[in-house]
Amino acid sequence: MLDILEIMKRIPHRYPFLLVDRILEMDKEAQIIKGKKNVTMNEEFFNGHFPGHPIMPGVLIIEGMAQCLGVMVMENFPGKVPYFAAIENAKFKNPVKPGDTLIYDVKVDKVKRNFVKATGKTYVDDAVVAEASFTFVIADM
C-alpha cells in the first residue's frame, strides 16, 4: 500500500532508525495499520547485539510498531511528531534473527486531545514475537 518513500514522507525517522519498509494495510475507520520490516544481517544493531549470535533488540521491534502507528496517526496532526509517554505489558516471545520478516499489526484504542493509546503485536511466520501497549503524546518536532 505504501512503499518506503511514502513512509518517509509521513514520519521523520531515517536510516539506521527507520524500522518499517512497507505499509501493507491501513484502515483509518477501524484505526488499524499493518507494516512490514525485512530484517537483514546488514542492520547496524547486529554489530553489537550480539556478535556471533545476532538478535534484534526487542525495544526496536516495539519502535517499529510505533513507527507504523505514526504513519497513520500523524495524518491527523500535521507538523507534529508522536513521542512515547508509556510502554506497558511489553512481552518478547521469540528472538528475531537476520532473514526474518516482521509483520507489525497495530490498533489505535483511544485518542484524547494530543494523547494516543494503542496496542500492537509483531509476527514472524504467523508466530507472535513481541507485543505491547503504548501511550504517545503528540507534540511539536
From Swiss-Prot:
Keywords: Cytoplasm, Lipid A biosynthesis, Lipid biosynthesis, Lipid metabolism, Lyase. GO terms for biological process: fatty acid biosynthetic process; lipid A biosynthetic process. Disulfide bonds: none annotated. Coiled coil: none annotated. GO terms for cellular component: cytoplasm; membrane. InterPro entries: FabA_FabZ (IPR013114), FabZ (IPR010084), HotDog_dom_sf (IPR029069). GO terms for molecular function: (3R)-hydroxyacyl-[acyl-carrier-protein] dehydratase activity. It catalyses: a (3R)-hydroxyacyl-[ACP] = a (2E)-enoyl-[ACP] + H2O. It is an enzyme of class 4 (lyase). It is found in: Cytoplasm. Its EC number is 4.2.1.59. The active site is at residue 49. Pfam families: FabA (PF07977). Involved in unsaturated fatty acids biosynthesis. Catalyzes the dehydration of short chain beta-hydroxyacyl-ACPs and long chain saturated and unsaturated beta-hydroxyacyl-ACPs. Belongs to the thioester dehydratase family. FabZ subfamily. This is 3-hydroxyacyl-[acyl-carrier-protein] dehydratase FabZ.
